[in-house]
């Protein structure tokens, strides 16, 4: 009989010292600093690290249906053998469908009335999935089947941590 594997249940802690974040004169940053530094972290579990060393493929599709998935063997294999989130929906945001992609890639809610992807190109985005994977030694690529500059993805996606390819730039 094999021994039960040991599951690391230590806290998930981001090595960030909130005391070093300059907040003087900025009430919003002060409030955020106080909030995040007081939070109790969640604990790791049996799923933590289960994909270490594996490839990760995230597909975001503006409209996608299971009805024709069997006609595309590679997508069919990914859907039937991987994680398939069938009840994930993004709300209708005011600007464009790219806001759903923005939410999926950044983990944040887009700002109303503006092109969040374009605006994010000027911000530090260290916590995106691509940036986190790069820290672990992975490469992160993003592809789109429209023109390279569509929705200013040529500015936003490299800033999110991706090597970006689209029509006119590698696709």
Name the predicted role of every residue range.
Residues 2-171:
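Soluble catalytic regions of membrane-associated enzymes that act on cell-envelope
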């Amino acid at each position: 009989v094999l021994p039960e594997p040991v599951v690391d249940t230590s806290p998930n802690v981001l090595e960030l010292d909130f005391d070093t974040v300059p907040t003087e004169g900025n009430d919003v940053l002060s409030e955020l600093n106080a909030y995040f530094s007081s939070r109790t972290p969640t604990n790791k579990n049996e799923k933590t690290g289960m994909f270490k060393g594996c490839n990760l493929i995230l597909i975001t599709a503006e409209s996608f249906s299971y009805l024709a998935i069997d006609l595309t063997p590679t997508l069919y294999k990914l859907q039937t053998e991987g994680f398939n989130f069938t009840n994930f929906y993004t709300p209708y945001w005011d600007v464009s469908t790219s806001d759903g992609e923005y939410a999926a890639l950044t983990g944040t809610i887009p700002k109303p009335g503006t092109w969040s992807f374009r605006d994010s190109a000027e911000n530090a985005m260290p916590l995106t999935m691509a940036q986190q994977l790069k820290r672990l030694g992975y490469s992160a690529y993003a592809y789109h089947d429209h023109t390279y500059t569509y929705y200013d993805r040529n500015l936003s996606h490299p800033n999110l941590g991706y090597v970006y390819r689209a029509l006119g730039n590698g696709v």
